[in-house]
């Protein structure tokens, strides 16, 4: 019962907040949402990035509102990316290893799905496989996060406008022999096999799927594959989704490999991924500056590595240097920062459950959709009204 009442109350509260400002004027509705997740990025990682820049402000520090979120999963103090991704994407706790479902197997609606129902263009940009957690939680329902072929099947029928990341093998080198990219192309998708094709794309729907389970770490990319990929891909995604002719857009961008480097206790690799992600955040903030009605939300799914910053061995506190020490090669239960910028950012302050983020985003989508309907003209808001060329397909 509480689960049903809370979203209704939240929408009501946000409707009241959106109805007027101090002057009695209607507040700008949230039209576009850019949700940015640093996988494995906790307060220690954000601190390390600031320290490495000589305490010069990071792009994330441009945020006008900040908060803290708790990451524990259903039945566990330390979450994995599947449970954390489900909380951030859908607004409910679940067990580790579970994607887009409650512990008892009930499918959950994600923020991305809610945005589709509101008539928005939708997209995902990541540096890992698109079928990995947490991005998969925005589209799929899967009791086993490692059943990535099944997740790919759900992506293929999801109606998402833009899908960018690694993991092509789960679409085209499958145990069932199906070529999902061909099936997607038959429904109107363009396919971009590499970065150059992605950046040259002009329309959606688009699937840019790269080989392997992830792109190279930015700091270890001797082949020049990575470069400024995340920044350029974020820019391209915003360009395509904002020009898609929908009632705004929802874009999820993940700096996926902060987590991988931290699992390996690779300080240089971790810092390289943090810098890359921070540059992408700056791109999103810049777009919000130019386009009122845009909310940019930045957070992590959990902290990885149990990172601490301490004086070098034998030195006193107050030294100009610091030593990075990882206490584990796994996740920790550390609280995670939340940075909010743009329209609606004021709703993401204080200490919150990770589930509150998705619930508030859904409520803001609902409020914006109602205001658009009330003050312009009725808009198609069901999944069946998505463009026919890439409508959702049933999956076996």
Q: Could you tell me what each predicted segment is?
A:
Residues 8-17:
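Bacterial N-terminal signal peptides
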Residues 190-194, 225-243:
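A Trp-anchored, charged/polar loop motif used as the substrate-binding/catalytic surface
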Residues 35, 163, 208-210, 250-254, ...:
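Structural motif
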Residues 21-174, 180-198, 204, 303-386, ...:
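N-terminal catalytic scaffold of extracellular/periplasmic and nuclease hydrolases
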Residues 133-139, 212-222, 237-238, 245-248, ...:
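Active-site His/acidic residue clusters
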Residues 43, 275-316:
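Metal-dependent active-site segment of extracytoplasmic phospho-/sulfohydrolases and closely related
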Residues 1-9:
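Bacterial N-terminal signal peptides that target proteins for export
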Residues 391-393:
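Short, intrinsically disordered C-terminal tails of secreted or membrane-associated proteins
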């Amino acid at each position: 019962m509480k689960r049903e009442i809370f979203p209704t109350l939240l929408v009501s509260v946000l409707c009241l907040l959106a109805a007027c400002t101090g002057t009695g004027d209607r507040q700008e509705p949230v039209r576009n949402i850019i949700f940015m997740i640093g996988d494995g990025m906790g307060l220690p990682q954000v601190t390390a990035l600031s320290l490495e820049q000589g305490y010069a402000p990071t792009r994330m520090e441009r945020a006008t509102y900040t908060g803290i979120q708790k990451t524990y999963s259903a039945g566990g103090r330390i979450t994995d990316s599947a449970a954390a991704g489900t909380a951030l994407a859908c607004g409910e706790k679940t067990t580790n290893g579970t994607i887009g479902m409650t512990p008892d197997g009930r499918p959950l609606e994600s923020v991305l799905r809610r945005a589709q129902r509101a008539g928005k263009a939708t997209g995902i940009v990541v540096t890992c496989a698109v079928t990995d957690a947490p991005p998969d939680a925005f589209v799929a329902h899967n009791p086993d996060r490692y059943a990535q072929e099944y997740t790919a099947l759900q992506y293929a029928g999801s109606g998402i406008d833009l899908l960018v990341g690694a993991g092509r093998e789960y679409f085209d080198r499958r145990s069932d022999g199906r070529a999902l990219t061909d099936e997607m192309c038959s429904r109107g998708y363009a396919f971009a096999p590499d970065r150059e094709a992605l950046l040259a794309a002009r329309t959606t729907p688009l699937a840019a799927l790269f080989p392997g389970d992830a792109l190279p770490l930015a700091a270890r990319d001797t082949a020049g594959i990575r470069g400024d990929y995340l920044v350029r891909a974020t820019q391209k995604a915003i360009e395509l989704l904002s020009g898609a002719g929908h009632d705004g857009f929802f874009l999820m961008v993940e700096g996926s490999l902060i987590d991988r480097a931290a699992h390996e206790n690779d300080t240089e690799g971790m810092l390289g991924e943090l810098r890359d992600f921070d540059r992408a955040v700056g791109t999103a903030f810049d777009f919000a500056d130019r386009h009122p009605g845009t909310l940019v939300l930045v957070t992590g799914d959990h902290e990885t590595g149990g990172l601490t910053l301490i004086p070098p061995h034998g030195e006193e506190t107050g030294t100009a240097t610091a030593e990075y020490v990882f206490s584990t090669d796994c996740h920790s239960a550390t609280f995670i920062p939340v940075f909010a910028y743009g329209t609606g950012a004021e709703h993401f302050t204080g200490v919150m459950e990770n589930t509150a983020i998705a619930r508030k985003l859904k409520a803001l989508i609902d409020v914006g959709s109602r205001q658009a309907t009330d003050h312009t003209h009725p808009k198609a808001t069901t999944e069946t009204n998505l463009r026919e060329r890439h409508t959702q397909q049933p999956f076996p």
